[in-house]
Amino acid sequence: MKKFILLLFVAQLSFAQNYWQQHVEYEMDINMDVSDFTFDGEQKLVYTNNSPDTITKVYYHLFFNAFQPGSQMDIRSRTIKDPDRRVGSRIFGLEEKDYGKLNISSLKQDGKNIIFEERETVLFVRLAKPLMPGEKTTLEMIFKGQVPLQIRRSGKLNKEGIDLTMTQWFPKLAEYDHEGWHPNPYIGREFHGVWGNYTVNITIDKSYVVGGTGYLQNIDEIGHGYGEKTKKTNGDLLTW
């Protein structure tokens, strides 16, 4: 009995020493146009390779692109035997102004342009310089999005009268773990992402109130009872 316990302890210790997970630091500046619910974004991502592997490519999720007629999610929802009743054929019937869109304009690695390809809900990126174990690299991106009519979780103009419900709305780096990359096309299932920190600036019409996770950095400027003092902002826009 004593030998068995000792061996089990050694096995657990060995596993703990070999455990690793990747890490990301996001910085994003978002400008939302509430006249048509489109947004422009700039993203800076610092990716730390804590794995024992050399990384030569990365993938991003572009979830909003699933909300277009003919997408894998649309086809699946219309052809499986037990479809999600919230979806069904609703994506197929969307007008273009109500599509979900997420498109990349440019992408750089450590200041150098790199090759990328949009494959519906997945962005494939070939790194200009391999990312070695223990190293970091900075990926800078310019992108544009369009918020879809709310069908499932995320979208605009829901039945509760909320203009924007934003989930999985930005280009999100896919997970890399001991099994490799997980660039799964989005078909309405669960999400899997990299552990990290986010700094996000959202500029929107100042008549809107933004609710979300995280810590508000400019409480006195925002007002709405967040801070002790309220400083009125000139103009029509406000950055949260």
Predicted regions and their residues:
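Sec-dependent N-terminal signal peptides
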Residues: 3-13
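Short aromatic-acidic-glycine turn motif
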Residues: 64-74, 208-211, 224
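Short strand-edge motifs at loop-to-beta-strand transitions and within beta-strands
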Residues: 121-125, 137
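Short Pro-Gly-centered flexible turn/kink motifs
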Residues: 132-141
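Extended, low-hydrophobicity, Ser/Thr/Pro/Gly-biased non-transmembrane segments
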Residues: 83-101, 105, 109, 116, ...
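Beta-strand-rich interaction surfaces with strong enrichment in secreted/lumenal proteins
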Residues: 17, 28-30, 45, 112-115, ...
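Asparagine-centered strand-capping/turn motif at beta-strand->loop junctions
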Residues: 47-51
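N-terminal, polar/Ser/Thr-rich
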Residues: 15-40
